[in-house]
């Protein structure tokens, strides 16, 4: 099945791909959509070159090692998603509306997840509500491709 992006946790790429395409060094510490950015950049230049197969099997060995606190992940997802959106997609009214709608949907889903999975961490809801504001306060930096304001908080 042809695809516009491939998850790199189970993706296979030819070695020569890495001579032309690279992971963006703005993404730090934890895996959050850098695979989307990497593989989508391949798709943009070589459409019909990415495939996924439903027959592929792999084992995801979950571990707590290297996981970041939920609060940090909330802000990371908001900042990195805006970065990808601004750098990979046309700024049409349709795309902007779809992006905003998807962020709103994710906000609702994540609030429900917190209420169900982490009822003792209900304060995380405030982080989910503030993360889009944080992104807008730093919008010009994100648009310029400078994520240092956020990445320095990860070290």
Regions found by a protein language model. Give the residues of each.
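Short acidic, glycine/proline-rich loop/turn micro-motifs
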Residues: 24, 62-67
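Short, flexible, basic/aromatic active-site loop/helix in glycosyltransferases
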Residues: 1-3
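Catalytic core of nucleotide-sugar-dependent glycosyltransferases
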Residues: 58, 68-95, 124-145
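Alpha-helical elements of Rossmann-like donor-binding domains used by nucleotide-donor carbohydrate transfer enzymes
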Residues: 37-41, 80-83, 106, 131
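A short, conserved alpha-helix in the catalytic core of glycosyltransferases
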Residues: 5-21, 27-56
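Membrane-proximal basic amphipathic "stem/tether" segments
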Residues: 97-155
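Short glycine-enriched, charge-decorated loop/helix-capping segments at active-site entrances
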Residues: 27-29, 67-70
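Alpha-helix N-cap/helix-start motif at coil-to-helix transitions, marked by capping-box chemistry
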Residues: 7, 72-76, 98, 102
């Amino acid at each position: 099945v042809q695809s516009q992006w491939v998850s790199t946790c189970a993706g296979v790429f030819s070695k020569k791909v890495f001579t032309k395409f690279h992971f963006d060094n703005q993404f730090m510490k934890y895996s959050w959509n850098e695979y989307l950015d990497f593989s989508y950049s391949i798709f943009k230049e070589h459409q019909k070159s990415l495939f996924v197969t439903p027959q592929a099997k792999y084992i995801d060995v979950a571990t707590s090692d290297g996981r970041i606190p939920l609060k940090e992940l909330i802000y990371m997802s908001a900042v990195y998603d805006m970065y990808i959106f601004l750098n990979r997609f046309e700024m049409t009214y349709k795309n902007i509306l779809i992006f905003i709608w998807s962020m709103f949907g994710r906000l609702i889903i994540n609030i429900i997840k917190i209420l169900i999975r982490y009822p003792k961490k209900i304060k995380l809801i405030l982080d989910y509500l503030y993360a889009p504001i944080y992104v807008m306060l730093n919008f010009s930096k994100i648009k310029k491709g400078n994520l240092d304001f956020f990445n320095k908080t990860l070290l």
